[in-house]
Amino acid sequence: MSQWGPRAILVQTDSTNRNADGDWQAAVAIRGGGVVQLNMVNKRAVDFTPAECGDSEWAVGRVSLGLRMAMPRDFCAIIHAPAVSGPGPHVMLGLVDSGYRGTVLAVVVAPNGTRGFAPGALRVDVTFLDIRATPPTLTEPSSLHRFPQLAPSPLAGLREDPWLDGALATAGGAVALPARRRGGSLVYAGELTQVTTEHGDCVHEAPAFLPKREEDAGFDILIHRAVTVPANGATVIQPSLRVLRAADGPEACYVLGRSSLNARGLLVMPTRWPSGHACAFVVCNLTGVPVTLQAGSKVAQLLVAGTHALPWIPPDNIHEDGAFRAYPRGVPDATATPRDPPILVFTNEFDADAPPSKRGAGGFGSTGI
């Protein structure tokens, strides 16, 4: 795509595809701060074939947007609901990596029994964002520095989450820990092991934030112990005791869901991770059966972008009830400092014009869950 410049994004819609009229209408919009969007609406009836949802009021399924994209490696696309929309189907927030070359699918949640959408019923925004390749700066677990004498032995038979009880007893009384409990269903999903160093015994925490590959938009968030999310319920997951340090530049960290889990009816409430706090996010189970996320699963992803990149995602968005009541919709930010927007280049020769990528058309869990 070098012929169009380093900020060019190649786009093919089903309407620009040769000899095809397409099911979707797409319009380009530039929002506050130079943020570029595609605003899409279905102009024909769209079939909806949800996955088995059991005893649930909701049906979850994928809908093709008839859209393919090729972005520079420092860009990603966010699939989300528009700022203003009616009480119809819910479009779950999704993240598209720069290396994805397949047709973009939106995860849609609708009342159980829905099998299609009338023309104009589905409205989807695609927002293009600059992203940062630098991982966030985290503290060590508090126990390493403040409580080395309290490192729990894996064989001590202690409570399942000894570090999340809010206090541990010492010879001098109770000592408060910075890990916060949000409601009764917070689950610490990290892994702590006792290690011996030249400075004495301390606790090591297994990495919860995996290195980012070149074409990835976000850093995968890993859990080290199984977590069960109840049927039609929600669980708050804290993957690590590490605290986010204040960024030196205009950056913010956002916790977003994974497409593969969204499509199974497991929705991560998008949340901005504020500095000075440990990471925590809500997983909502819209199915009628309990779902267990196995140890070693990638359950969310961490996106590092500009402070004003996603202003409509609230910080510390911990709500254990009403997956949609507080689910954020896109809101343009009119106060951000303007910057040079990317250039959208529409083509009907996508396969010939798009540069090759390692990921190709693999998506929805193709890189592991």
Curated annotation (Swiss-Prot):
Entry keyword set: Hydrolase, Magnesium, Metal-binding, Nucleotide metabolism
Binding site for substrate: R258, S259, S260, F364, G365
Catalyzed reaction equations: dUTP + H2O = dUMP + diphosphate + H(+)
EC supergroup of this enzyme: hydrolase
EC number: 3.6.1.23
Primary gene name: DUT
GO terms under biological process: dUTP metabolic process
GO MF terms, alphabetically ordered: dUTP diphosphatase activity; metal ion binding
Protein name, entry field: Deoxyuridine 5'-triphosphate nucleotidohydrolase
HAMAP family: HSV_DUT
